[in-house]
Structure formats: C-alpha cells, structure tokens
A protein has these predicted regions:
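Anionic-ligand binding patches
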Residues: 10-12, 25, 46-203
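A generic local structural motif
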Residues: 1-2, 65
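N-terminal beta1-alpha1 ligand-phosphate binding loop
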Residues: 3, 7-29
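Cofactor-binding loop segments of dinucleotide-utilizing enzymes, especially the Rossmann-like FAD-
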Residues: 16, 36, 124
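A short beta-strand-loop structural module common to alpha/beta enzyme folds
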Residues: 32-40
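Short Asp/Glu-rich motifs
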Residues: 43
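Active-site regions of enzymes building and remodeling cell-envelope glycoconjugates
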Residues: 30-32, 48
Length: 203
C-alpha cells in the first residue's frame, strides 16, 4: 500500500443504500450522495461480472448526470457499488415482495452461499472496477422463523432478503471473507482498488 491518502479528493457515493452511507460515515470519509436511474437488467449470469457491470453503470450514470448539470468533477471520485447473493447457481437481488423474500430465505436455509459486491471508481480520467466474494453460512430456518423475519426485518431493500447486521445475524453461523462486503461495501477491496487506480490509499 502507498503511504499517502486521498485527503484532497472530493467523494461522491452513487448509491441509495443507507448501509453504504453508514460504512463511509463510520470510516470518517466526507462525501456527498448522488443517485441516478439506471437499468439493472442484464443477461450476464456470472455474479462477479454482473456486479462489476452494474456498479460501473451506476457510477457512469451519476457522472453523466453531474456533467449535464455543469458540475466541475476535477479532483472528484465517484464511488459506486452493487451487491447480489448467489446460491445453487441462482443470483438473488432484492425481493419483489413477501413471497419472493420467503422463497429466497428458504433457498438460503441450511446452506452456504456467496455474497458478491462490485466496486467501481471513476474520477480524473481514470476508471477502476473490482469485486469481492464472501461466503456466508445460514442455519436451518423453519417456516415460523422465516415468517417472523419477514414481518420484523422488512427485507425488501436487501439482496437475498437479509442484512447481516440486523436480525439475520441470529441465523448466521459463520462467514468466510470480508464482513463489510456482506453489509454492502467491501472496505478492503475499496481501498485496494483505489490504490491501484489512483496510486494512493483511500483511507
């Protein structure tokens, strides 16, 4: 890792996720949040390629929006991310409704699955994209537990219908890899990618 840090850069988080905002705030990063509508449909079936693609789309959409508004983006880095859950060859995004959340939780029950997050950095004429994979092991969930979780946790804005930092933590017996990746923003991967792209540490 480089010895210097990005103290003179302006950061924009291209995400609506309160969890990603909270991670950056807890790290002491000063940033603003800007979002833009993006097409999240894709024929890509590999979760690693998919999250990199969607992360890049989000970042580019915000960049184009700000340039159209006449913003000066010099010394500005746009951070974007996307997360999915992969299990049994299926990619799980956010559940559409309670029935979809129920289906997802039953798929995850008693199994190991992968949480895959993409990270994209755009700024000063440079572009970097990467991904992180974390394995998560769920307990067996009976129907009563699934219904209680759906009623209590409101899982509709979460990939795979759960958040590790909430009620679902009671059902997770272990993880292998980056915890923050499961929350929604892989901090180590972000710092590594920033160093590779801009030649200095993010943190």
């Amino acid at each position: 890792m480089k010895g210097c840090t990005a103290i003179n850069m302006n950061f924009i988080l291209a995400s609506k996720s309160p969890r990603r905002r909270e991670i950056l705030e807890n790290l002491g990063v000063r940033f603003e949040t800007v979002t833009a509508d993006t097409d999240e449909s894709s024929d890509v079936t590999d979760p690693c390629r998919l999250v990199e693609l969607l992360s890049a789309r989000k970042g580019e959409a915000v960049r184009e929006k700000l340039l159209a508004e006449g913003r000066d983006l010099s010394d500005t880095v746009i951070i974007s991310s996307d997360t999915v859950v992969a299990v049994d060859g299926e990619i799980l995004g956010k559940p559409r409704d309670a029935a979809d959340a129920r289906r997802m939780l039953r798929l995850l029950s008693g199994k190991a699955h992968q949480v895959v997050s993409g990270v994209c950095l755009i700024g000063n004429g440079k572009f970097g994209v990467s991904h992180e994979v974390t394995e998560v092991l769920f307990d067996e969930l009976d129907d009563e537990t699934v219904e209680h979780y759906i009623r209590t946790a409101k899982p509709y804005d979460k990939a795979g219908a759960y958040a590790i930092q909430g009620l679902a933590s009671a059902y997770i017996s272990g993880i292998k890899g980056c915890y923050f990746n499961v929350v929604g923003l892989p901090v180590h991967r972000l710092n590594t990618l920033y160093c590779e792209t801009f030649g200095e540490n993010f943190l």
